């Protein structure tokens, strides 16, 4: 603020100085103007003098006013534009009157004209102000110079404040920059002092921040600490004492805080790099504010274990009353720590544990066993820095440490463990000793297993406290509860229904015994050492072998006899046929059979049977032959019945007649008119021709006409007459017409039942039937070749040949009958095609297409009949009135 005030005062002084110079210039110009007026006017001396005084006084006031306005404009109190307008108005109001013309008598003349004094000027309001009268005579040279001088002065009036303001702003900016530079320089000096102090402290403590790490330690037990301390060689008593002197020599709370901050910073950087070792030893050397002596050195050693077992415990070992300010390490919340202190000298190589601490914690320590012989030397590990991981901010840890210290100090008897000071030369670490037996009251001897993150093992407990067995899961989607609305699940009560645990476990529990048996069986069977087949093919053979569910000896015996295998087993055997290369590998294998897998053993046994897979195919053919023959015979008989139904159906022929007459009537005058026959494909197009109302089709009209004609025919028959006599004789013609229509619709709709075999035949594939007959013929020929040629003359194959010979005779007879049926049916189908379509030898690719067309037409006819039953005919002479 002081610099800012000085800068502001400097700006004001510079501005006032500029305005003062300008004021003196304006006063000089005003005096010259008065002198000129006195010299130029000879007559009217008093008038001129009076005007000059008036102008001088008014000019002085105007100059003062202008200076004041400029100063206000500089301070941003008023705008320059407003002052400019005000100056113009005042100059107009105080402008002098024009000078009178000179006298006509230059020498004075006889009569001297009196000079009248001018009237005092009155101020004119701005809104009534008139423009000045124009001069009739040219301006004189002094007036022109005066105006030029005024113009130059106006420019100077504008330039001077601008330059002054700019200079003041630049000066202010320069001052501010200088202040910031001074502050930054001072701060840099302070940081340099702090860094130099930290360097000195780092050099003094570098001797105590090196310690060797033994990765083979087991820090869960106290004996391992002693063994490890015997191998430590990086810390010396002299270095620790020198470090304590340096630490005690520091005075001031600020320096102590900086030291702690620097150490904690090094801890945070080194902690991440120290995770590669399984064990870490942390030594922290801190000073005591109360005692400034060398003997007050405190060296707590914090042992950190990376594992997070539940059996880890906190052990505190103290050795005297100087541990008045203990610190605990918070490196890991689940790791144990051991604090080892030396009271006055490091020559006492013992760790003392008070009896009070043992009694409080219930720990009994047994003597460690003798150390084993040292192993061969191991490569040396790099030393790690000492990490001070004390967190005094934690109130709970401080309270716990103070309590432990009091118990340790109050103890009288102690149990000591020998600890040797590490030598200057590093020695290879021995293998870890066996763990000490720690017996804690209320805790088992063996440590509990580590916590597992597998939530599937954490099963809920039942009423008796035992874990509930795992059942088969029911997959569903949970519904989240909504507090703002009521749901049906809120009304359920948990106590209203209880499960029968025994029943649900017996029904939906996992069969653990079977799985264990399977595992035992798998473990007993040794894994094969050799594989003759490819893994993928071997996997397929293994799956098919499970489907057989029989041994190799049973299969080979059944193949030799030609009987004894079911259809499923024969199908699996046929699928297991190996290739020629695989069969050659199996035959040429001379090694131990036990080394092969189960599938390879089975295949090798089958390969030893002559024509084993051909026998299986022959037996499968015999098993399926009868079913194939029955299916073909049923299909042929169905085709024959369908052909008979189409030829003998009187109603179908009547329907074709109605369609032919209707089509010829509609095609009158066209090339399609006058037809005597049409292909049955036209039946499917009747529903595409719609009437004028957009609903009635040509099929509706045909069905209506046939129903009416068939109804009249039925009523004229003997049965119709009997029914008419029983009914009322006084029926109206409309009622009779309705009866005719109803009886005719019943007859037309019965056409679906009459042509039922035609509808079934439409689903038959005639080419498939012909192919099936051909396959049966080929299979029977292969079976005959196998039995009569390949296996003939061998005594071992006599049973198979005899069983197949009887089947060959039956098969040949059945196939001969099938050939005759096939020939007859194909002739009937050809006759039906010619019966309806004429000569279609080269046009019809599918001989059964006629049956497909009739099936589709019967479906359309049944739909139209259902529609006509739902519509009642009104009192109208036209039968198609309901469709208009």
From Swiss-Prot:
Keyword Signal: yes
Topology in the lipid bilayer: Single-pass membrane protein
Gene Ontology cellular component annotations, sorted alphabetically: membrane
Compartments where located: Membrane
Lineage: superkingdom: Eukaryota
Keywords associated with the record: Membrane, Signal, Transmembrane, Transmembrane helix
One GO-annotated biological process of the protein: actin nucleation
Signal peptide bounds: 1-18
Gene3D superfamilies according to UniProt: Formin, FH2 domain (1.20.58.2220)
Pro residues bias: start-end ranges: 97-107, 115-126, 367-379, 425-436
Compositional bias annotation for Basic and acidic residues: 346-358
Region (Disordered): 89-143, 307-384, 416-469, 512-532
SUPFAM superfamilies tied to this protein: Formin homology 2 domain (FH2 domain)
Cited InterPro entries: FH2_Formin, FH2_Formin_sf, Formin-like_plant
Entry similarity comment: Belongs to the formin-like family. Class-I subfamily.
Function noted in UniProt: Might be involved in the organization and polarity of the actin cytoskeleton.
The protein's name: Formin-like protein 11
Gene that this sequence comes from: FH11
């Amino acid at each position: 603020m002081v610099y800012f005030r000085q800068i502001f005062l400097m700006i004001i002084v510079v501005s006032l100085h500029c305005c003062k110079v300008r004021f003196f210039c304006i006063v000089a110009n005003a005096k010259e103007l008065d002198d000129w007026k006195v010299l130029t006017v000879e007559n009217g001396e008093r008038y001129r003098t009076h005007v000059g005084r008036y102008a001088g006084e008014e000019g002085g006031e105007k100059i003062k006013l202008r200076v004041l306005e400029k100063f206000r404009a500089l301070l941003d109190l008023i705008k320059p534009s407003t002052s400019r307008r005000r100056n113009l108005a005042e100059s107009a109001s105080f402008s002098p009157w024009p000078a009178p013309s000179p006298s006509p008598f230059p020498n004075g003349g006889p009569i001297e004209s009196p000079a009248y004094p001018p009237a005092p000027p009155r101020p004119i309001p701005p809104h009534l102000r008139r423009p000045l009268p124009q001069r009739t005579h040219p301006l004189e040279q002094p007036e022109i110079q005066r105006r030029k001088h005024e113009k130059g002065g106006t420019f100077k009036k504008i330039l001077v404040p601008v330059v002054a303001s700019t200079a003041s702003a630049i000066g202010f900016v320069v001052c501010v920059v200088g202040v910031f530079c001074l502050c930054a320089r001072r701060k840099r000096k302070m940081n340099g002092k702090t860094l130099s102090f930290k360097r000195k402290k780092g050099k003094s403590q570098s001797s105590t921040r090196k310690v060797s790490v033994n990765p083979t330690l087991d820090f869960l037990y106290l004996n391992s600490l002693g063994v490890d301390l015997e191998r430590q060689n990086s810390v010396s008593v002299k270095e620790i004492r020198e470090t304590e002197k340096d630490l005690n020599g520091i005075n001031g709370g600020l320096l102590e805080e900086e030291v702690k901050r620097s150490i904690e910073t090094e801890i945070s950087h080194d902690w991440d790099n120290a995770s590669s070792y399984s064990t870490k030893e942390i030594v922290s050397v801190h000073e005591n504010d109360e005692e400034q002596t060398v003997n007050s050195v405190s060296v707590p050693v914090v042992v950190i274990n990376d594992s997070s077992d539940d059996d880890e415990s906190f052990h505190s070992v103290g050795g005297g009353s100087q541990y008045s300010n203990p610190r605990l390490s918070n490196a890991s919340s689940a790791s144990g720590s051991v604090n080892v202190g030396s009271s006055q000298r490091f020559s006492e190589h013992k760790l003392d544990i008070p009896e009070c601490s043992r009694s409080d914690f219930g720990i009994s320590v047994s003597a460690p066993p003798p150390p084993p012989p040292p192993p061969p030397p191991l490569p040396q590990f790099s030393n790690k820095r000492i990490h001070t991981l004390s967190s005094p901010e934690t109130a709970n840890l401080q309270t716990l440490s103070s309590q432990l210290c009091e118990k340790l100090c109050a103890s009288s008897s102690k149990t000591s463990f020998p600890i040797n000071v590490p030598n200057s030369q590093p020695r290879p670490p021995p293998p870890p000793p066996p763990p000490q037996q720690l017996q804690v009251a209320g805790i088992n001897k063996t440590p509990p297993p580590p916590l597992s993150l597998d939530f599937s093992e954490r099963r809920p407990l039942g009423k008796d406290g035992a874990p509930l067995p795992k059942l088969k899961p029911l997959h569903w989607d949970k519904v989240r509860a909504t507090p703002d609305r009521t749901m049906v699940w809120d009304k359920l009560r948990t106590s209203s229904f209880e499960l029968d645990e025994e029943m649900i476990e017996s029904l939906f529990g996992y069969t653990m015994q079977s799985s264990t048996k399977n595992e035992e069986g798998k473990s007993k069977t040794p894994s094969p050492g050799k594989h003759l087949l490819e893994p993928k093919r071997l996997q397929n053979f293994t799956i098919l072998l499970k489907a057989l569910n029989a041994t190799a000896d049973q299969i080979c015996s059944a193949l030799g006899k030609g009987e004894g295998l079911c259809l499923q087993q024969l199908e699996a055997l046929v699928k297991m046929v190996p290739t020629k290369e695989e069969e050659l590998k199996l035959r040429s294998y001379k090694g131990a059979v036990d080394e092969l897998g189960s599938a390879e053993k089975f295949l090798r046994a089958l390969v030893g049977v002559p024509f084993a897979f051909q026998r299986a195919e022959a037996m499968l053919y015999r098993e399926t032959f009868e079913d194939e023959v029955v299916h073909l015979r049923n299909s042929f008989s169905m085709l024959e019945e369908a052909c008979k139904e189409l030829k003998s159906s009187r109603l179908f022929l009547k329907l074709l007649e109605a369609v032919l007459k209707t089509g010829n009537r509609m095609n009158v005058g066209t090339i399609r008119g006058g037809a005597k026959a049409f292909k049955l494909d036209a039946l499917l197009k009747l529903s595409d021709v719609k009437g004028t109302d957009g609903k009635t089709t040509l099929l509706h009209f045909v069905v209506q006409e046939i129903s009416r004609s068939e109804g009249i025919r039925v009523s004229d028959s003997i049965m119709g007459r009997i029914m008419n006599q029983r009914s009322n004789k006084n029926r109206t013609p409309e009622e009779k017409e309705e009866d005719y229509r109803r009886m005719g619709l019943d007859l037309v709709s019965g056409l679906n039942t009459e042509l039922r075999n035609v509808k079934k035949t439409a689903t038959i594939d005639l080419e498939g039937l012909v192919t099936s007959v051909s396959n049966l013929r080929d299979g029977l020929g292969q079976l005959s070749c196998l039995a009569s040629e390949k296996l003939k003359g061998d005594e071992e194959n006599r049973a198979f040949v005899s069983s197949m010979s009887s089947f060959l005779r039956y098969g040949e007879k059945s196939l001969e009958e099938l050939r005759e049926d096939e020939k007859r049916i194909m002739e009937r189908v050809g006759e039906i095609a010619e019966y309806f379509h004429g000569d279609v030898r080269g046009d019809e690719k599918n001989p059964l297409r006629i049956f497909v067309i009739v099936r589709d037409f019967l479906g359309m006819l049944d739909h139209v009949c259902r529609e006509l039953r739902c519509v009642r005919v009104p009192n109208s002479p036209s039968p198609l009135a309901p469709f208009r």
